[in-house]
Amino acid sequence: MQYLTQEQAIKLDEELMGKYKYSLVQLMEIAGLAVAQVVTKEYPIEKGNKRVLILCGPGNNGGDGLVCGRYLSLFGYEVTVFYPKQSKNEHLQLLIKQLEIQDIPVVTELSSFEYDAIVDAVFGFSFKGPVRGIFKDIFSHINSLKVPIISVDIPSGWDVEQGYLQDGIQRCDVLISLSAPKLGVKNFKGIHYLGGRFIPLELKDKLHLILPYKENELIVKIN
């Protein structure tokens, strides 16, 4: 399995949206659906995992979380989106409106963390530490819980190339790497999936990426 540096991950996204004409909207939709599929696979409703908290950051990773929340609601989960630092980006605001129209709570404060699973969609591969402000307090509280955590692309607060940092998410049970895994999760010991199947075959071959999907799979376990 090949692991991407931060620079490689950024250039990959640029090429997807440049030469291959993907929009950010498309990438978020495909990524968010993949995350939702991982949640249903690892924490199915029939095993008592109905209440899911989606913790969203202000950037694109948070957008993936918003999309994930919409799909999980369609799949029958009781979803709450915790979005303490909302972006004014037009597309992200549209994603919020979609949730609100479908009566999916989007909140900026939480009085309880009593959920069956938490989706960590705060910081992605563009993050450069350290963790500051409200998210430092949120991560500290989440790290004290025993609720399963599913991280999107990389556990929030980790260095994209060096891995775990003290003020980030300390315990990630399930990780879904988008496009290709990042260098900072090379030694990740939890359940690891690959998702976000939007890399054209030509680009895959050019970058020598190993993407072990079979036929019509949108997610695949890689450990």
Curated annotation (Swiss-Prot):
UniProt keyword terms in alphabetical order: Isomerase, Metal-binding, NAD, NADP, Nucleotide-binding, Potassium
Protein name (database record): NAD(P)H-hydrate epimerase
Binding site for K(+): 61, 120, 156
Cofactor: K(+)
Binding site for (6S)-NADPHX: 60-64, 124-130, 153
Family: Belongs to the NnrE/AIBP family.
Coiled-coil features, chain-numbered ranges: none
Organism: Entamoeba histolytica (strain ATCC 30459 / HM-1:IMSS / ABRM)
